[in-house]
Amino acid sequence: MVSMNMFEEVEVEAYVYPTEDIEKVKKAMLNLVPGLKFEAFDKGEYMILVGRTRDKRALQRLYELFRGQQILDTARMMLEEGYFGEEIIIKVHKQVAYVGKVNFNEESPLGPITIIIRTKEPQKLMKWLAPRTKDGVPIE
């Protein structure tokens, strides 16, 4: 289990287009990060749905998915690529998230789900969430 001080907040964002059901987009976001509190911003052509949480268990689902889907190496690479100062930003496929899985292919006609992890300890968080592996086995 992750300690409370490993991150300050997790924010999850997605565009919601008129052809989409906002409740399904919320479900996709909650499948990755449970406990989100939502706000929606109407931009005319689309809405921006933003969910935020400070719950210490917020990243547990991603932790489990990265291991269950055996994608620790890819997850680690994406976390490192998205690491900027005190934020780690990853983008995942919205429709894949709806069925409860993670796919880092953000190329989707409906746009990705963006996960922003705000942390003062990014290295420690990345090591916990997606440790380096050798032959698929965590080594750190």
From Swiss-Prot:
Signal peptide: none annotated. SUPFAM superfamilies: RL5-like. Pfam families: RNA_binding. Belongs to the UPF0201 family. PANTHER family: UPF0201 PROTEIN TK1335. This is UPF0201 protein PF1297. It comes from Pyrococcus furiosus (strain ATCC 43587 / DSM 3638 / JCM 8422 / Vc1). The lineage of its organism: Archaea, Methanobacteriati, Methanobacteriota, Thermococci, Thermococcales.
